[in-house]
């Protein structure tokens, strides 16, 4: 790394010469006065549109593997229940169970294509917001923008699935590696510690890809970790935790809206997720 690159990285982490408190105040003003929350609402809509085609794809794929698929499906739903609000995860669980029984190759292909297509519109919305944050106008042709959005969506899906696999089966993977290469118990203990930083690295990499390719920036340098990606991940984890705690003690959506309560809760969680992604982009800008 030459001195020029070192200066660029140092400048990035100096946050434009702003103190953290000043940066937080400026980011809040941008959120309050701008259209970030409106764009986050649009993202929640695209996330919801992409969710159920994605479930059709995943459950159809799992249905082709019978016993192993049943175990993996149960583990995925159990993990979703630990991250998403209870009512939202229950809605997803019910939908998955209804779809799984009729898994076919046609549903597999259709679900994958539909999930990628709808999710790519959400990626385009993220790009529009980041362009506004950086003060640039979209100049890429439509076909190129669609390809970038689809490619980003596919890459993020692969990263998220890999991270989930490590979360759900990290222990088994470590034991398998230790047994195959005769690495011993020390490796198992070390693996149990390092698998979580690896999962975090996958998530940060997903955010870094989004912030690098989604906006129309001509001469942007690549950074594995940025203040915005750290802010986005931390904020997403925080709002997910706070929302779960709130619903645990003050869940009135199901009482007020009946069966629609779970859908509303899922949309709110997607809304907060979209806002966290966009706030991270604002911090980088």
Residue ranges of model-derived segments:
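Membrane-embedded alpha-helices and immediately adjacent juxtamembrane helical segments
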Residues: 1-285
